[in-house]
Amino acid sequence: QAKEVATNRSFPPSGDAAVSAKVREANGFLPWYFNLPADEAKFAEAWKQAADSKGFSAPYGQPPAERRHPQFRSHGVGKCEWDGAIWPFATAQTLTAMANFINNYQVKPCALAVSSKGSLDMDSLYFNEMEKYVQSQSMRGKPYIGEYLDETTGYWLKGDQERSRYYNHSTFCDLIITGIVGLRPRADQTIEVRPIIPAGKWQYFCLDKVRYHGHDLTILYDQDGSRYHVG
């Protein structure tokens, strides 16, 4: 497991591979992007950091470095810093990894609060982070994906400068299709649909004309049948 995917329980070393970095980075979630870690509690515990406001849970998304570190957001602004501001593609990588963890792994991390019982509600965590992701991708009331944004205010740090406005680095559609709606890509001819929508959040949804393995699919949910009048 690549030296326990670092001695710091699932977060890899930087630089010298024999010495763990003194800061957790969101790149530590990337092994789940490829379903690499074993389905064991010692690796699952890493996801508690995605829910921790001192870890990677910020008001406008998942920063690339943990918020508790003393040098978080300390390297200035506007020079491609990766010390805490939100980069949409990095967030997308974390969310893809999280969806894989939810769908493909049985062992889940313990609840964040010491006093709580049971496991961390990963479905709610994913949905809440997706809501942040959706809300962040706008500027002046219009859809927008920029270079990177402030993790607490949602302000695009490079505004609409050319360098920023050409940063089309979101996998937004994939996150909706394979994560929220839950059409899970497969090599065989099985259609697997596993939405990540906590109870009570949505009363209906419809994803129409999705081309998949040579077929056009419609995936819909209607809580009481009054929206689409089918099924």
Report each predicted region and the residues it spans.
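Hydrophobic side chains in beta-strands
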Residues: 33-34, 178, 221
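Catalytic-core signal marking the mid-to-C-terminal active-site face
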Residues: 205, 221-231
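Glycine-rich, charged/polar anion/phosphate-binding loops
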Residues: 15-17
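Accessory "access/gating" subregions that flank catalytic or transport cores
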Residues: 12-13, 33
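An alpha-helical repeat/solenoid feature that recognizes helix-turn-helix modules
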Residues: 22-38, 87, 91
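Aromatic- and carboxylate-enriched substrate-binding clefts and catalytic-loop regions
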Residues: 3-10, 19-27
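Non-catalytic carbohydrate-binding regions of carbohydrate-active enzymes
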Residues: 1-12, 39-215
